[in-house]
Structures are given as structure tokens and as C-alpha cells.
Amino acid sequence: MSLSTIIVIVASAFWLMILYHVVLTIAGLIHRAQTSPPETSAQYPSVDILIPAHNEGGVLFHTLDAMSKIQYPGKLEVYLLNDNSTDNTSDIAQYYADRLANIYHIKVPAGSPKGKARVLNYGVSISAGDLVVVYDADNQPNPDAVKLLVEKTLENDRNAGAVGTVRTINMQKNSLTRMIGLEFMVFQLLMQSGRWLLFRLGTYTGTNMLVRRSVLAEIGGWDEHALAEDTELSMRIVSRGFVIPVVPSSITYEQEPETLGVWIRQRSRWLRGNLYTISKLVKDPDLRHGQNLLNIVQMLTIYYAFMALLLFSDVWFVLGLLGILQIHFTIPLLILWFETVWIYAAQIVAATVSERQASFTNILFGVLMYFTYSQLWIYLVIKEYFFQLTHHVQNVEPVWDKTPRF
């Protein structure tokens, strides 16, 4: 097989994935435009909000203040699940618990494995509401966020719950937080709204999410060994025939990493957790059917094929600039490479428009992200491949790594 043929095959595969994401972008925009407020309910079921917290003193005042302002017509109880904090998390949690009748400060017993999933399972065991809502300890949801999730859940018995939108509260802090905020907008437009419109597929994002208690009981709660417990939970829920509708109007704001080191730690944990979920999906025949087949293909595409093609495109670009690779078809291959960059940037522009965050600065950062932020993912994925390989050989249990706050 000639070099030209190989390049054509690789370029075609890359462009097929780009085309798929273009379709998701259009579908996401249509979903956002079509989305109407959920129907109000005659009777609102009881809701328990679970907030896992470990050393969250720096952000907890804002979080619990936002929880105190949530407007919900039914019974609402908030459980601050204090996971052995050593800072002033306990003082802040107790301050609110002493003053508000529906906020509870729960001290979670020490246990193993450490992490969010174990704390959430404990929270489910000490609460009794019909619906369980999860927020991270740095979140500030809009007052109507929970109500919107509940109303969407109640529209259909197949709805396991619902998932809302996450926005970056510190997006203007620096270049990194701006790029993270833009990344979140694109993810929620394509992978949430776009996939929901086309395939009726939604994925929990770990916060601003609702799940029926009955569904949790049916699937056995959260997998306490999963570092990406939200994705893993979504896969098991989908395997049971449930769906997770996406509610763009239910909005929460959260803090994102402000330094590269913290970002790498956070995303390494996410990648590790998602690779664990891929392994579980591939190995478990009970999960490997129905709409989860699409989830498997998509996750394999993102974490294996797309990363390989992104690396290939970088090599292709450099060789083209240096004049080492000069293969021309109808259009020079370097021109096609530039077109992929503009399509990438166009998706970010579409996401900012849908979130009413369009600006010259965001468009400029959208272009720069391809050459900077996106390339960091190559390093992260390769790093985590080696991590998974060495820890599998040594039979080492993965360890939860909490994201520091600012």
C-alpha cells in the first residue's frame, strides 16, 4: 500500500469524524432552539440534594447559600456529606444546618475505597426522598434548576432522571479557565443536546443531575471503584432501557481549575475513569447492547481513534510545512488540514452563540484552542494509557484525586 493511499484512508477517517461532529453541532443548535419549558406537575415528589464535600471550606459558603435559594414546590432536603474534612468545612456546614431546617450536615464515616461514589452511596442510605439530585461542593445552581430537572423527569416513566447544564463561574479568570469554559459549552451542545436530539442519549455530568431513587436501587447505586462515576452510572442506566433527558435551561455554575497543574490532575482522573468505563463496557455483555453500543463506539473513537488521528494530523502539518510531505490530490492536503481547524473553531463559535457568550475574544480563543488546549489531550491520553497498563500489571487500585479549589 502506497503512502498516498494510507494518507487518503487516514484523512477520510478523520473527516468522517469531523463530519459527525458537524452533524452533532447542527442537531445541538436545533435542540436548543426547540426546547420548551417542561410541563409543571400537579404534585411534586420529594427531592434529596446530595453534596459530597472534602475540604471545601473555600467555596462552601457560596454553595450552601445557593442551595438555600432553590425554589421547589415539593419537599426538598439538602445533605452536605462531609467526607472527613480537615479544614473549616464542618464549621460552615454546621452554620447552615443550625439555621435552615432543610439543610443537614452529615459526617460520612471513614471507609474504602475513597472517593465521590462511596460518599454518594452513603448519602442515599441515610436519606429517603423519591428523587436524588447531585451537586458538587463548588456549585451554585440557579433557583429553578432542580424544579426543571424534576419536571423533565416526570414527563415519562422511561426517564431515569435528567441532566442540566454546567457553566464556568470563573471563566474570565485567565486563558485556561476561558478555554475550559468554551470546552464545556461545546461538550454540552454536541454530546448532550446534539446526541439527545439524534439518538435520545444523554450522559450524567457528575453535577446538576437527577436520578430516581428507584432506578438507583435497581442498578445497585454508584460503582465505588469508578473514578468517572457519572459516566459509569449513565452506562448502566442506559443498559436497563432508561433514558437521561438533557435540560439546557437547568443551569448551575461551578469553579474550574485555574492552573495547568490542577487541570492535568483533574483531567487525568477523568480520563482514568473513562478508560475504566470503556473496559467495563467492552467486557460486560449485560452493558454491551442497545444504545450503549453507540456509547462504546463513541468512547473508543474519542479516546483511541480521534487521539491517534489528531497526532497524525500534527505530524502531517509539520511535514507539510517543512516540505517533506508534498502529496497533492485535487486540493493540497495542507489546505484540508487548515479546514479542519476552521471547522473546530466553528463548533466553538456555535456553542458560544447558543450560550449567548459570543465575542471576538471567545472566537479568537476558539482558534487558539486547536493549537494549544486540544494538543494537551494527546499528552494526557498517552500518559493515562501507560498508567493503566502499569497499574493493571501491578494490580494497583486507582486512587481518587480531589480537585483543589481556588
Report the location of each language-model feature.
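Short aromatic/hydrophobic "clamp" motif used to bind/position activated sugar donors
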Residues: V132
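Acidic donor-binding segment of Leloir-type glycosyltransferases
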Residues: D65-P109
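Cell-envelope/extracellular polymer assembly enzymes that use nucleotide-activated donors
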Residues: P45-D48, E77, A217, E232
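N-terminal signal-anchor transmembrane helix
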Residues: L24-K75
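Membrane-embedded multi-pass helical conduit in multi-pass membrane proteins
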Residues: I6, I26, I30, E39-S41, ...
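Long helical/loop segments within the catalytic core of UDP-sugar-dependent glycosyltransferases
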Residues: A101-P109, P113-V119, G123, G129, ...
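Catalytic donor-sugar/metal-binding loop of nucleotide-sugar-dependent glycosyltransferases
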Residues: S234-T252
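Catalytic core of nucleotide-sugar-dependent glycosyltransferases
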Residues: E183-Q188, I264-P285, A345-A350, L380-F386
